[in-house]
UniProtKB/Swiss-Prot annotation:
Principal location class: cytoplasm
Name of this chain's protein: Serine--tRNA ligase
Annotated organism of origin: Fusobacterium nucleatum subsp. nucleatum (strain ATCC 25586 / DSM 15643 / BCRC 10681 / CIP 101130 / JCM 8532 / KCTC 2640 / LMG 13131 / VPI 4355)
Annotated Pfam families: Seryl_tRNA_N, tRNA-synt_2b
Gene for this chain: serS
Family: Belongs to the class-II aminoacyl-tRNA synthetase family. Type-1 seryl-tRNA synthetase subfamily.
Residues annotated to bind ATP: R260, R261, E262, E347, I348, S349, S350
The organism's taxonomic lineage, starting at the top: Bacteria, Fusobacteriati, Fusobacteriota, Fusobacteriia, Fusobacteriales
Keyword Metal-binding: no
Pathway: Aminoacyl-tRNA biosynthesis; selenocysteinyl-tRNA(Sec) biosynthesis; L-seryl-tRNA(Sec) from L-serine and tRNA(Sec): step 1/1
Domain of life: Bacteria
Catalytic reaction list: tRNA(Ser) + L-serine + ATP = L-seryl-tRNA(Ser) + AMP + diphosphate + H(+); tRNA(Sec) + L-serine + ATP = L-seryl-tRNA(Sec) + AMP + diphosphate + H(+)
Keyword line: Aminoacyl-tRNA synthetase, ATP-binding, Cytoplasm, Ligase, Nucleotide-binding, Protein biosynthesis
Known partners and oligomeric status: Homodimer. The tRNA molecule binds across the dimer.
Length: 421
């Protein structure tokens, strides 16, 4: 969330930013409402001043045993007017807050300007995609042929975009999760969490999923929301708190299932594990001061890269352009892993610095010598587990339909080094 003072002082800049972000938030409506609010506030203050002066005059008249009925009657009308204007102020404030909550974060100056992913900037590549001497299969064909991924029964249980993992696939998914958490906690200093999978609306509002993306979230009958990422829960751990600067940065990680309606993705990735309503993810979250957040973003990207490098999966790092940037992010790097069956790189991690945008929404601050400042929050996939399984199955596949287990995962698989019939 942006500060109102900042919004008032940067209307034209924000109009340009919103255009570059493909956002249709109406800044002219904000300017009109803000101007109206100032008018109403001024009128309320004048009326309250008049009422206060009249109260003193009434007291003097009564002291002098003089009639004050005409003033009392007039002040009754003034009080009614003040009450009406206060109600109007509440209505105006709600409209301003709605605009404020729907304005995306201001992007970092280094962000490429462009309407869509075609304008993203490739930063670097790692690894060389393997050349197969046979036609590489898709992960869903490999999984179904081996009997370890069952999309038909997943759909029978829950509908489209659900899958049933069986045997080696279930074990490998668990191995991937444990491997990722071990690297992040034992080597990189993250503290592991197991968080709730359902949260209050105000928690989703804090990280920016609400109100803008409500249609993409699952809501329970008692107004709780299933988390679409554990970024939501971990970033909100310290909501409405003031931390000591010496405590920062905080490094948090968690595995969780994630639940997404995938609204607006009709027809995209309808087969396989790439786009599901329920999937597993290991998430990284950092809470930092304002000075160190961009250094911490680079470290977070490196943390995600470490997983891919240990798994020996070819990938590239791209910086997202203005039109492809997430709502709460000021700067984002995506990691895209190579998928042989698609002959292209696909997103497997997104690492973002949200600066003070989320912290301002959730009231998360840290102490400084002359008061307090809003924390900066960062989040990143470390990694999306199902997509990691996809990349392993496709990049490690063999001509006979089996696929190898990456060396670093063999100990987590009890010594199993190949998945076959």
């Amino acid at each position: 969330m942006l500060e109102l003072k900042f919004m008032r002082e940067n209307v034209e800049m924000l109009k340009e930013m919103l255009k570059n972000r493909n956002s249709n938030v109406d800044m002219d409506a904000f300017v009109e409402l803000d101007s109206k609010r100032r008018e109403v506030l001024s009128e309320v203050e004048n009326l309250k001043r008049e009422r206060n002066n009249a109260s003193a005059e009434i007291a003097n008249l009564k002291k002098e045993k003089k009639n004050a009925d005409h003033i009392i009657e007039k002040m009754g009308e003034v009080s009614t007017k003040i009450k009406d204007l206060d109600a109007e102020l509440v209505e105006i404030d709600e409209k301003i807050k709605d605009i404020q909550l729907n304005i995306p974060n201001v992007y970092h100056p280094s962000t490429p300007i462009g309407p869509d992913e075609d304008y993203n900037l490739e930063i670097r590549k790692w690894g060389i995609p393997k050349k197969f001497d046979f036609e590489p299969k898709s992960h869903w064909d490999i999984g179904e042929d081996l009997g370890i991924l069952d999309f038909e029964r997943g759909a029978k249980l829950s509908g489209s975009r659900f899958v049933l993992y069986r045997g080696a696939a279930a074990r490998l998914e668990r191995a991937i999760i444990n491997f990722m958490l071990d690297v992040h906690t034992l080597e990189e200093g993250y503290t592991e969490h197991i968080t709730p999978f359902m949260v209050k609306a105000e928690v989703c509002e804090g990280t920016g999923q609400l109100p803008k993306f409500e249609e993409d979230m699952y809501k329970t009958t008692d107004d709780m929301y299933l988390i679409s990422t554990s970024e939501i829960t971990m970033t909100n751990i310290h909501r409405k708190e003031i931390l000591e600067q010496a405590e920062l940065p905080k490094y948090y990680t968690a595995y969780s299932p994630c639940f997404r309606r995938e609204a607006g993705s009709y027809g995209k990735d309808v087969k396989g594990l790439i786009r599901l309503h329920q999937f597993n993810k290991v998430e990284m979250v950092k809470i930092t001061d304002a000075e160190s957040s961009y250094d911490e973003l680079e470290k977070m990207v490196n943390n995600a890269e470490t997983i891919l490098q240990r798994l020996e999966l070819p990938y590239r790092v791209i910086q997202l352009c203005s039109g492809d940037l997430g709502f709460s992010a000021a700067k984002t790097y995506d990691l895209e892993v190579w998928l042989p069956s698609q002959n292209k790189y696909r997103e497997i991690s997104s690492c973002s610095n949200c600066e003070a945008f989320q912290a301002r929404r959730m009231g998360l601050k840290y102490r400084v010598p002359n008061g307090s400042e809003f924390c900066h929050t960062l989040n990143g996939s470390g990694l999306a587990v199902g997509r990691t399984l996809v990349a392993i199955m496709e990049n490690y596949q063999q001509e006979d339909g089996s696929f190898l287990v990456p060396k670093v995962l063999i100990p987590y698989m009890g010594g199993v080094d190949v998945i076959k019939k």
